Amino acid sequence: IFFDNSKIDNYPLPQLKKHMGWDANILNLCLDKNDVMWVNQDRYGLCLYDLSQDLFADNSDNNLSNPGEVSIIVKSKLKEGVWISPRYGARVMRMTHQDMKIQLEEDIDLEKQIHNPGNIRDLVEDNRGNLWIFTQSGLYVKRPDNSVLLAASSDFPEMSSLTSDEEGNIWGMSTDKKVYRLSCIDRNISYELKGCIPVLSGQENVNHVCIDRKGCLWLVSSLGRIFKSDTDKETFENMALDNRIDDCSVLGLLADENNVWIITNKKVLQYDIYQKICMNYATSDGNIWVDVFRYRAISKDRQGGLYVGGHRGFIHIQSGSVLSADKIQFSPVVTDVKIE
């Protein structure tokens, strides 16, 4: 583990504190295609922050496009804007902005189409522009040209988590610890069994999952163990990163460029899959102003770096952070010899 935190930018959002009277407490982050950060402030709701102009705007006066607090914000791949899910109610909304004002483009109320859909657990968009909506009751797909949702069949495996690979293919981990490739073609949601996860114990579940650019599947279990598969997703190895999590709670797992990011409430681990170097960024570091990382306040920067937010704003870990550690070479030094 190397410690070199020179490439950290801090965004304490003083405009937000001045407007509300208390520190920023960010629960969600999402950087859109226009370099505008979508921010969900705890107990307040959706805001916008233009990084290039240091310009902040809230959405409190916009009754038509104000979802209140949200639980999910993900960038739209095919269309402009972001997909969001409000904290209360089973709705999915696509939103854009014009002159730092939020605009509602699409609004899908799941309760009008599905009986007892339950809360929305995740949103993932595939390479065809299909939005996969993972709820407590099942799996649904919103096609890019149709607001009528498609529902997975009753014999569809029960999923515990979804992710997408670099090509935009959708993968699902089932509650019985199997790996599936999912697809939606011609109004049909299908699944293909690709492997099993035998390394998990009986009561151990998959909490977080991602796929790196090599095609290897990474997962964090409910016991805090970290596993990585081979490219065929058939065999798994326990990564020696578990002890770096310590007593932290894992918030997310992301793959981007050469890195896999493991985000916890107290630290961020950046693992370079080619150099096999791991960087550690902790809230206790002097150049990180955020006290604690929160919920889903995680967003890629499209250049191999990461934005992570929480109490007192958010930080930007720039893409060159691991490269500086690459120059450090270590060789063993004998300190003791014991003869028996």
What are these regions (language model features)?
Residues I1, D42-L46, Y88-V92, Q136-Y140, ...:
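Loop/turn residues immediately N-terminal
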Residues F3-K7, D50-D54, T96-M100, R143-S147, ...:
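Short loop/turn segments that connect beta-strands within beta-propeller blades
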Residues D4-L16, D23-L27, N34-Y44, D50-D54, ...:
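Acidic, proline/glycine-rich low-complexity intrinsically disordered segments
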Residues D9-L27, D42-Y44, A57, N62-E69, ...:
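Residue-level "micro-hotspots" composed of small/polar
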Residues L31-N34, V74-K79, E125-R128, S164-E167, ...:
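Residue-level detector of Asp-centered blade-edge/turn motifs that repeat once per structural unit
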Residues V36-W38, G81-I84, N130-W132, N169-G172, ...:
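Conserved beta-propeller blade signature
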Residues E167, M173, K177, N207, ...:
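Beta-propeller domains
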